[in-house]
A protein has these predicted regions:
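Short, glycine/polar-rich helix-capping loops at beta-to-alpha or helix-loop-helix junctions
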Residues: 143-149
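Short beta-strand segments
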Residues: 62-65, 89-92, 138-139, 185-186, ...
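Short, surface-exposed, charged loop/turn segments at secondary-structure junctions
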Residues: 102-112, 150-158, 203
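Internal, well-ordered alpha-helical segments in soluble enzyme and binding-protein domains
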Residues: 6, 109-112, 147, 169
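Catalytic cores of soluble, metal-dependent hydrolases
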Residues: 1-61, 73, 79-83, 152-267
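Active-site histidine-anchored catalytic micro-motif
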Residues: 59-126, 134, 223
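Short, glycine/acidic-enriched loop or turn micro-motifs at the edges of active sites
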Residues: 69, 93-97, 142, 188-190, ...
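Short, structured patches in soluble enzyme cores that scaffold and shape functional sites
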Residues: 90-93, 117, 137-142, 160-162, ...
Length: 267
């Protein structure tokens, strides 16, 4: 329930009129022989999320929950901007590039990006998968061997935590995709454990909040945002949630505040 509590804690600081809630079943769900834990529960959440998204207009900021919320959010953003070429920047300590066959845990949050790329359980693969050429992994520093091999074989672009300290590094990687618009995924474990406590799978040598906010700001200075996701907030107690919320709200602000790009400036 920590992920549910994390999402609820963030919701408490968001404007109610601009927030919609997706119902999440409390049952454990079944794998149905797919090698994916809780598959049927994931299907139910995806259906509910798609129903809510169908009634929205404009870019949506999706608050998880785990990274599986991107199964509904990213295809929705791409379909809403079908005339544009979209890059997905995946800020995450982990690649989320396992498959049911390679996953050590069979937990779906480690397979989300692979599924969005069209290689995952059939019931969850989107109708129009991403291409590896659209994806930029940012701040990723913990990969299983099969994930690393998939990155090498597919040519997915990567920007390390060290490289993110260089201004413009992630924008340059996006430019190489040829995209005109961007979707930003943020798994909060991309941050260094010294920066945030409420994540389930912390990894050392991550970003500071300031570095992440700056990277998001640099992206938005060059590319319109078609949507974003913030995931994996799992505080252990309400008090711990309160300690982390100021950092999370800074990230939300970086994703939502108005931005005037150079081409939009008034002469």
């Amino acid at each position: 329930m920590r992920l549910v509590d994390g999402a609820a804690a963030i919701q408490g600081d968001l404007p109610a009129a601009a927030t919609r809630v997706v119902d999440v079943p409390v049952g454990a769900g079944e794998s149905q022989g797919t090698g994916v834990l809780r598959l049927t529960a994931l299907q139910s959440v995806l259906t509910n999320q798609q129903r809510v998204l169908a009634s929205t207009t404009g870019p949506v900021i999706t608050i998880g929950g785990d990274c599986a919320v991107e199964l509904g959010a990213i295809p929705h953003a791409l379909a809403s901007s079908a005339e544009s070429t979209i890059a997905v920047v995946w800020f995450d300590a982990h690649g989320d590039l396992n498959s049911p066959e390679t996953s050590p845990s069979h937990a779906f949050h480690g397979m989300v990006l692979r599924t969005l790329l069209g290689d995952g359980p059939e019931a969850l693969v989107p109708g129009s998968p991403l291409s590896p050429a659209q994806v930029v992994l940012a701040g990723t520093r913990s990969l299983d061997d099969d994930e690393a091999a998939f990155i090498d074989a597919s040519g997915i672009r990567t920007v390390t935590s060290t490289e993110l300290q260089q201004p413009g590094s992630v924008a340059e990687a996006i430019a190489q995709t040829g995209a005109s618009r961007v979707y930003i995924h943020v798994d909060l474990d991309v941050l260094d454990p010294a920066e945030i406590d409420g994540v389930g799978y912390p990894e050392p040598f991550g970003l500071s909040v300031q570095q992440l906010v700056q990277a998001i700001s640099q992206i938005r200075a060059s590319y319109p945002l078609v949507g974003a996701g913030i995931t994996e907030f799992a505080p252990s107690t309400p008090e711990a949630a309160s300690d982390d919320l100021p950092s999370i709200l800074r990230i939300i602000s970086a994703l939502t505040r108005p931005v005037q790009r150079p081409e939009e400036a008034t002469p």
